């Protein structure tokens, strides 16, 4: 476990470690994304942060607060439905015209759903698109900017379920036939980890897949009808609260996950002399090697190899198969 004291010490040094960072927060207007964005504003010097969300009017109080926390910062809102891949491409093209590099891509879009498959106008399930396809598309399209970041390569953080990988159906990866709540969750989590491993092997960027733990956010209020949300908020949450992570601490820890030298890219992690410049040794990557560039992480900053199931998937060639499926499907979607 990375102690909270270490997290705070590191975050407090970011003004000198990471001068004038450029970041994109997808889903940054509430919950963990919002909390992490606030910590970025508090701990960095003159950041530029693009914030993608569904409602500009709802985001105005946040943008005002960020400006007060960091008057030298630039905080720009982009209103978009990122369940549509075409919108993702449009956002990425806009950022590439404005920026030469990107230090951080931080993604939390999604939510919960008790209903079945709901297809977007592009033929993807909406929740699956938010949890997996759109996130990978952002990483894919913004890779040139992430690789151009200095002094350290850029980092991609996807907050979902790192370390909870499991079985997926290789003949129904997009769940056109066998969609249900659990299959969507398992495919989203496992395919994210496999796709990140694929990217980390050859890219000058690092990839972090985080399970955030139990955090007090408005996810149930935003995802479910009022009666059901009330059952959770007033009936279940009080029982779960003692085991939860405070939303402010979650933001502090996720900023550490997003910027610490503990999770370097493959190009740095393999060079222990470069990695040693940081105060913390490189973490074990998802494939079992130090500094591999892809990391499966819990809320405390501990990393795992995801055990026998990921090993089995690698042996079966699922890393390459998932990546090929993903790129082909995304390209077909926007034709």
Feature roles, as predicted:
Residues 102, 146-168, 204-206:
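Active-site loop of short-chain dehydrogenase/reductase
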Residues 2-78, 94, 171-335:
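NAD(P)H-dependent oxidoreductase Rossmann-fold/reductase module
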Residues 26, 100-110, 157-160, 208:
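Rossmann-fold scaffold of SDR-type NAD(P)-dependent oxidoreductases
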Residues 57, 79-90:
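The beta1-alpha1 cofactor-binding region of Rossmann-like NAD(H)/NADP(H)-dependent oxidoreductases
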């Amino acid at each position: 476990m990375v102690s909270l004291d270490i997290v705070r010490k590191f975050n407090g040094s970011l003004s000198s470690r990471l001068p004038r960072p450029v970041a994109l927060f997808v889903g940054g207007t509430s919950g963990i994304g919002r909390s992490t964005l606030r910590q970025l504003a508090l701990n960095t010097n003159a950041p530029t942060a693009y914030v993608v969300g569904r409602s500009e009017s709802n985001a105005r109080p946040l943008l005002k607060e960020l400006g007060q926390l960091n008057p030298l910062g630039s905080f720009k809102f982009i209103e978009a439905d990122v369940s549509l891949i075409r919108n993702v491409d449009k956002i990425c093209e806009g950022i590439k015209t404005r920026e030469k590099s990107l230090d951080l891509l931080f993604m939390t879009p999604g939510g919960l759903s008790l209903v079945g498959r709901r297809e977007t106008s592009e033929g993807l399930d909406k929740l699956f698109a938010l949890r997996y396809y759109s996130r990978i598309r952002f990483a894919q399209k913004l890779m040139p900017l992430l690789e151009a970041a200095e002094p350290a390569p850029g980092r991609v953080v996807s907050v979902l379920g790192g370390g909870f990988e499991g079985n997926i159906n290789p003949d129904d990866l997009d769940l056109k036939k066998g969609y249900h709540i659990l299959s969507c969750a398992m495919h989203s989590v496992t395919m994210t980890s496999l796709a990140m491993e694929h990217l980390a092997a050859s890219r000058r960027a690092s990839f972090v897949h985080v399970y955030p733990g139990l955090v007090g956010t408005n996810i149930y209020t935003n995802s479910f009808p009022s009666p059901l949300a009330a059952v959770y908020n007033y009936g279940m949450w009080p029982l779960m609260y003692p085991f939860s992570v405070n939303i402010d601490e979650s933001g502090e820890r996720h900023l550490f996950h997003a910027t610490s030298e503990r999770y370097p890219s493959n190009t740095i992690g393999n060079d222990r002399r470069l990695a040693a410049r940081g105060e913390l040794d490189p973490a074990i990557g998802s494939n079992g090697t130090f500094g591999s560039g892809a990391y499966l992480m819990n809320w405390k900053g501990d990393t795992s190899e995801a055990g026998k199931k990921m090993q089995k998937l690698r042996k079966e060639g699922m890393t390459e198969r998932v990546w090929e499926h993903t790129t082909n499907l995304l390209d077909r979607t926007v034709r």
